[in-house]
Regions:
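Divalent metal-dependent catalytic cores for phosphoryl transfer on phosphate-bearing substrates
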Residues: 1-87
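Alpha-helical scaffold segments in soluble metabolic enzymes
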Residues: 7, 59-62, 77, 95, ...
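Short amphipathic alpha-helical interaction segments
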Residues: 70, 74, 88, 102-106, ...
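Charged phosphate-binding loop/patch that engages nucleotide di/tri-phosphates or the phosphate backbone
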Residues: 98-135
Length: 135
C-alpha cells in the first residue's frame, strides 16, 4: 500500500482516485510498522473506509449460514456477530465504529446499508468465489 500511489500514478490514475484508494487504510498500521495517515475526506472515501472491514465480517457470517448467502441475513445477525469479538477477529470493530462515526451514521444504519449493497450483488460475489475455487 505504500507503493500504491506511485503505481497508480504510473498507470495514469487521477489524484482523486489515488487519495480514495490510500485513505481507505487510514489509521491502520501495516506490516512494515508504518501507519497510513491519509484521512478519508469525501463521502465515497468514508463509505469505503467504513465498509471495507464490515464486508469481511458480513461475508464471514454468511459463510457460517446453511445458505452461505447474505440474501437471508438480517441486521440482527450482523449485530450479534459484531458483538462477538472472537468471530472474524481480524475484522476491526474499532475501524467499523470509526467509519460509522465519520459518516455520521449509527452502526445499525451502516450495517443495513452495507448488507443491502452486498445483497444487491450477491450473484457476482458467488460467481467470483466459484472462480477462485477453480484456480
Amino acid at each position: 500500500c505504500l507503493k500504491a500511489p506511485k503505481l497508480l500514478r504510473e498507470g495514469g490514475v487521477g489524484e482523486d482516485i489515488i487519495h480514495s484508494v490510500v485513505s481507505h487504510g487510514y489509521g491502520i498500521t501495516i506490516g512494515c510498522g508504518v501507519t497510513l495517515d491519509v484521512a478519508p475526506e469525501h463521502e465515497m472515501e468514508k463509505v469505503l473506509f467504513a465498509a471495507d472491514e464490515l464486508t469481511g465480517l458480513i461475508w464471514a457470517a454468511a459463510l457460517m449460514r446453511p445458505s452461505k448467502s447474505v440474501m437471508d441475513m438480517e441486521v440482527s445477525s450482523i449485530k450479534k456477530k459484531f458483538k462477538d469479538k472472537r468471530f472474524a477477529a481480524g475484522c476491526s470493530r474499532d475501524t467499523i465504529r470509526t467509519g460509522a462515526e465519520n459518516l455520521g451514521w449509527e452502526l445499525n444504519e451502516l450495517f443495513d446499508k452495507t448488507l443491502r449493497a452486498m445483497q444487491s450483488c450477491e450473484a457476482e460475489i458467488q460467481e467470483e468465489m466459484k472462480q477462485e475455487e477453480r484456480s
